[in-house]
Amino acid sequence: MSTVGSTVSSTPSRRFKHRNVNTFLTYSRCPLEPEAVGLHIWSLIAHWTPVYVLSVRETHEDGGYHIHVLAQSAKPVYTTDSGFFDIDGFHPNIQSAKSANKVRAYAMKNPVTYWERGTFIPRKTSFLGDSTEPNSKKQSKDDIVRDIIEHSTNKQEYLSMIQKALPYEWATKLQYFEYSANKLFPDIQEIYTSPFPQSTPALLDPTAINTWLENNLYQQNSNSNRKLSLYILGPTRTGKSSWARSLGRHNYWQNNVDWSSYDEDAEYNIIDDIPFKYCPCWKQLIGCQKDYIVNPKYGKRKKVASKSIPTIVLANEDEDWLRDMTPAQQDYFNANCETYMLEPGERFFSLPAVSATAHPSSEV
């Protein structure tokens, strides 16, 4: 049985994320046999050690069939591909089943036929332990956190469970739990959409910018030479940020550099309105270096930049990086970065054409 769309692409499917040991799927108007669907799902989640799969056919009001599937695994099934569970062109509604008991009861409320394999794991009455039972064994903190990791479905739920189960640790070590939450449930990078209509930059020397783009951004597979970064200095309201952000997938930093959300799949970086003295690892960024160590705030030191990508630095005249550098720093900067200084009237967008029939303003 074929699986449709099982590869991650650069389409909006990047925004999807599923992570849970209990997965609830509903295939609407699906004529496939429950056994065939169940066997396919069992095979599909083999990497996460399936322990139970229930596949139920239900009659819909219009006379067609739905297929409900409850899949339980020893390890959380994780995917960022919205088409991961597609079967022969049928795309399911995908949910994290917080209560496996309720989901199973719902799926079995009026079955036409069903198929199941493995041993159903009822939801624990409390995976934090029941201290009211005299012979109950108190869970260790490691067991508690392990259960929270397996059962939480998002960052907020994870932190809420930690707060409830380990209030003292939550109060005294919150920054570490926030760090682990970001690692377990990383933010999905949103595709930037410019709020302005597409237009041609009104530059005195567009060839300089176009040449930099061609040599350093558009030739992604060229590894013969290390790329050069780009420094753009000019007034505000000239469209620098919108233009730079519209070029492709990127890491964007404004006011400060936040390494915790570094996107390894980004094609370039943008440093927007950050003074030179407050930019960490500026040599690594400007020099398009790879595999360097950074120190995220409240997080552990880590290695980033598995590939060489250029950085676009955007600055206004009052925060000119070159003015704040030593001669040695300027030498390194100029050797690794193209510079474009906007002249009066230059901008990274074109003004709309004025109609010949437009009436002149009566304002004085």
UniProtKB/Swiss-Prot annotation:
This is Replication-associated protein. Homooligomer. Rep binds to repeated DNA motifs (iterons). Forms the O-complex, which is a Rep-DNA complex involved in the initiation of RCR. Part of the C- and V-complexes which are RepA-Rep-DNA complexes involved in the c-sense and v-sense transcription. One of its GO terms (biological process) is DNA replication. GO terms for cellular component: host cell nucleus. A motif (Nuclear localization signal) lies at residues 297-308. Its cofactor is Mg(2+); Mn(2+). Belongs to the geminiviridae Rep protein family. A divalent metal cation binds at E58, H66, H68, N110. It holds the Pfam family Gemini_AL1. The active site is at Y106. There are 3 rolling circle replication (RCR) motifs. RCR-2 is probably involved in metal coordination. RCR-3 is required for phosphodiester bond cleavage for initiation of RCR. A motif (RCR-1) lies at residues 24-27. ATP binds at G234, P235, T236, R237, T238, G239, K240, S241. Divalent metal cations, possibly Mg(2+) or Mn(2+).
